[in-house]
């Protein structure tokens, strides 16, 4: 019994010593990041789609902080670009020519052809595809950003990118543009 207690105490002390060493190393060797890059990255949609020409949102945020154009993010659209322009103190630019005329699309899986390989699930950066191994998969259209990264890995080519149709749920209501009349209260004489 005493040998077990000695082993438990020694392991506890060993864990405490190594924890202190790791804590010291984390403080001593901390890598300072650029706060501007962190702010720009927080504004980007985090789809990691690569449509901007960079391998993810963090490298694009670093490029923007280094002076690159702010209009290369199709999933973020004009709203994201305007927020980045405000943060960087530059004029908003129209989205780049390659993305300006594009219609928003979402992935659609033809479920009767899906073999359940899970390659599209692994490729989706926003977890908009649900399913399990050897079972059909489907796309949560509200979460899909249209990044197109799930199409290429599909071995049976059962994923299509379909344009988003406007309906009552997807319509962009501009409530501030609706005129509201202010009626004066009846004045008593």
Swiss-Prot record:
[4Fe-4S] cluster 3 binds at residues 124, 144, 147, 150. InterPro entries: 4Fe-4S_dom, 4Fe4S_Fe-S-bd, 4Fe4S_Fe_S_CS, Elect_transpt_cplx_RnfB/RsxB, RnfB/RsxB_Proteobac, RnfB_subfamily. It is an enzyme of class 7 (translocase). Its main location: membrane. The keyword Translocase applies. [4Fe-4S] cluster 1 binds at residues 49, 52, 57, 73. It is found in: Cell inner membrane. Its cofactor is [4Fe-4S] cluster. One of its GO terms (molecular function) is 4 iron, 4 sulfur cluster binding. Residues 105-134, 136-164 form the 4Fe-4S ferredoxin-type domain. Residues 1-26 are annotated as: Hydrophobic. The keyword Electron transport applies. [4Fe-4S] cluster 2 binds at residues 114, 117, 120, 154. Its EC number is 7.-.-.-. Keywords: 4Fe-4S, Cell inner membrane, Cell membrane, Electron transport, Iron, Iron-sulfur, Membrane, Metal-binding, Repeat, Translocase, Transport. One of its GO terms (cellular component) is plasma membrane. GO terms for biological process: electron transport chain. It holds the Pfam family Fer4_21. Binds 3 [4Fe-4S] clusters. Residues 32-90 form the 4Fe-4S domain. PANTHER family: ION-TRANSLOCATING OXIDOREDUCTASE COMPLEX SUBUNIT B, OXIDOREDUCTASE. Part of a membrane-bound complex that couples electron transfer with translocation of ions across the membrane. NCBIfam families: PRK05113.1, rnfB. Belongs to the 4Fe4S bacterial-type ferredoxin family. RnfB subfamily. This is Ion-translocating oxidoreductase complex subunit B. The lineage of its organism: Bacteria, Pseudomonadati, Pseudomonadota, Gammaproteobacteria, Alteromonadales.
